[in-house]
C-alpha cells in the first residue's frame, strides 16, 4: 500500500509540474495575439498551429475522461481547449477572408468532423477498457505526428549549420515538458501518456545538442550559397505565403521596374547595333510635344 501511495504522490508532483510548464507553453502566443488585437490584423500569421493544438487538447481531454485518477491531465487539456478557442476566435475576427475561410474549413473537417467521428465510433462500438485503449492509441498517433514536425527544422540546421530557425529557449522548454509528462505517465503506468513523450524528449535533446554544435556556425563550409538558400527554402516560401495577402503591391512594382530596366537595355542594344528602336515614332512625337 505504501508503494501505491508513493506512486500516486509522484504522479501528483509530476502532473502539477507538467501543468505549470504546459500553462506557460499555452500562454506563449499571448504577445502575438495582443499585437493582432492592437493592430486589428493577423499580419499574415497562420492559424494551423492553433487548430492542431485545439484538436490535440480535445483528444487528450476525451481520453482523460475515460481514465481514473488523471485529474491533472483533465485540467491542462481543458485549459488548452479554452485558450486555443480564444486564439482561434481572435484569428477569425481579424484575419482576411481567404485565411478565415481556410480556418473555418479546417475546424469543420478536423475539430468537428474528425472528433465527432471518433466520439461516435468509440461511444457506440466499443466499451470499457477497450474504449480507453483505442482513444489512447489515437492520441499517441496524433502526438507522434505533431512531435515529428520539428524534423524539417533539424534537417535545415544540419544542412545549413545554422541555428537561426531553432530557438534554444523553446527547445529547452518543450524538452523539459516532455520529460515531466513522461515521468507522469510512468508514475501512472500509462503507456499512452508516456510513449509520445519519449519521442518528444529524444527530439528535444537532439535539438539542444545541435544548438550546442552549430551555435557559432553561420553556414556550412561544404554548402554553396545556392545550396544554403535551397535548404532555407521551406521557411522562405512560408514567409512569402504569409506576406502575399498583405504586401502584394511591392512584388508587382518590383516586376514592373525590372521590366522597365529590361526594356531600356533592349533599346540601348538596338541603338548600338544600328537598328531603329521600337516605339521610335512615339518617342519622337512625345519629345516634340
Swiss-Prot record:
Expressed in leaves, especially in phloem. Expressed in developing seeds. The chain crosses the membrane at residues 10-30, 44-64, 71-91, 106-126, 134-154, 168-188, 193-213. One of its GO terms (cellular component) is plasma membrane. Residues 31-43, 92-105, 155-167, 214-289 are cytoplasmic. Residues 1-9, 65-70, 127-133, 189-192 are extracellular. Keywords: Cell membrane, Developmental protein, Membrane, Phosphoprotein, Repeat, Sugar transport, Transmembrane, Transmembrane helix, Transport. Residues 12-98, 134-218 form the MtN3/slv domain. The modification Phosphothreonine is found at residue 276. One of its GO terms (biological process) is protein homooligomerization. It is a multi-pass membrane protein. GO terms for molecular function: sucrose transmembrane transporter activity; sugar transmembrane transporter activity. Induction: Slightly induced by the pathogenic bacteria P.syringae pv. tomato, the powdery mildew fungus G.cichoracearum, and the fungal pathogen B.cinerea. It holds the Pfam family MtN3_slv. Its main location: membrane. It comes from the Eukaryota. Residues 266-289 are annotated as: Disordered. Disruption phenotype: Under high-light conditions, plants lacking both SWEET11 and SWEET12 are defective in phloem loading and display slower growth, mild chlorosis, and high levels of starch and sugar accumulation in leaves. In plants lacking SWEET11, SWEET12 and SWEET15, severe seed defects, which include retarded embryo development, reduced seed weight, and reduced starch and lipid content, causing a wrinkled seed phenotype. Altered sucrose efflux involved in the transfer of sugars from seed coat to embryos thus leading to starch accumulation in the seed coat but not in the embryo. It is found in: Cell membrane. InterPro entries: SWEET, SWEET_rpt. Forms homooligomers and heterooligomers with SWEET1, SWEET3, SWEET5, SWEET6, SWEET7, SWEET8, SWEET9, SWEET12, SWEET13, SWEET15 and SWEET17. Belongs to the SWEET sugar transporter family. Mediates both low-affinity uptake and efflux of sugar across the plasma membrane. Involved in phloem loading by mediating export from parenchyma cells feeding H(+)-coupled import into the sieve element/companion cell complex, thus contributing to the sucrose migration from sites of synthesis in the mesophyll to the phloem. Contributes to seed filling by triggering sucrose efflux involved in the transfer of sugars from seed coat to embryos. This is Bidirectional sugar transporter SWEET11. It comes from Arabidopsis thaliana. The gene is SWEET11.
